[in-house]
Amino acid sequence: MFFDPKSDMNDASTFDNPEKIFNLIKDQLLTTQKNRLTAIVVYLRAMKPDDRKLIDNYSKQMDSISGKYANIQNDQEKTAKQKDNWITLDEFKDVIEEIFDEIQKNEILKKKVLNNRDYSLLQSYVLLRMYLEFPLRNDLCNVKIIKSKLDDNGTDNFLLTRTNKTGSKFFLILNNYKTVKIYGKKIYPIDNKLVKLIKILLFFNKSSYLFLRYNREKSLSSNDLTKLMNRIFEKYIGKTVGTSLLRHIQISEYKKNDPTIKQIQEVNQKVEDKFLHSSKMNNEYRKIK
């Protein structure tokens, strides 16, 4: 068991041997190592504030890991895990098409009653179509279905379904996501073709949530969503792909013609050396109209 401040088994002496701890976490993701070391430093500062040598030891290791991670980010290099599971955007679309072919083969769209297997296949298709359209994190778990804006409590994520004589309009409402404090509430209109598919899914879904567990009794949790995504891609392409990797894949495709971070830094450095201004000042000096 690793560091758990809630456990009675842990006390400050647990971390008296830094090398042992470093060795214990060395094979974990750099981000995981960094987070664990940060937690230890915070813990030691509270529990053993006078042991500067011990705290500095962990702090230096934390800074070293942070530096390695920053270098990888600046180099825009895939991690080993990403390299093993990376797929192209076209391969992502191929998986979606393969699932749809299976849906057609089983005539699922013509059925009036779906067993759990058929429902799961249809849900997988709608889920991937949603993530192709909206490359979010695990924010599509626990999405509640509402029919009026008045039901939006400003806290949860919702699928707003509006149906009238002129047709149906659906909206994805995001109130709860990682960077909501920066970007605020987001309301996304959903494409009409996708609306038709969601309506079919909801015909067989009598709950108040968009995506359900296999038994169709409870909504997907964040962990359920991760496991489901992993199963889908392992089945159709033999790789472990989740929402985080899909975001990397899609934004890499979207920005594939942009200069790299390193190229931008090199240009900025040359301009700074030439004009003896910061990059910010050089951008302000630059006139485009």
Where do the language-model regions lie?
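Amphipathic alpha-helical scaffolding segments
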Residues: 58-61, 142-151, 253-254
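Flexible interdomain linker/hinge and immediately adjacent N-terminus
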Residues: 53-109
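Active-site/catalytic core of tyrosine-dependent DNA strand-transfer enzymes
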Residues: 183-246, 250, 255
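Conserved tyrosine-mediated DNA breakage-rejoining catalytic core shared by Y-recombinases
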Residues: 143-192
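Non-catalytic DNA-binding core/recognition domains of DNA-processing enzymes
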Residues: 1-63, 244-248, 275-278
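Eukaryote-biased recognition of C-terminal alpha-helical segments
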Residues: 285-287
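C-terminal catalytic core of tyrosine-transesterase DNA break-rejoin enzymes
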Residues: 245-277
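Basic, Lys/Arg- and aromatic-enriched nucleic-acid-binding interface segment
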Residues: 94-139
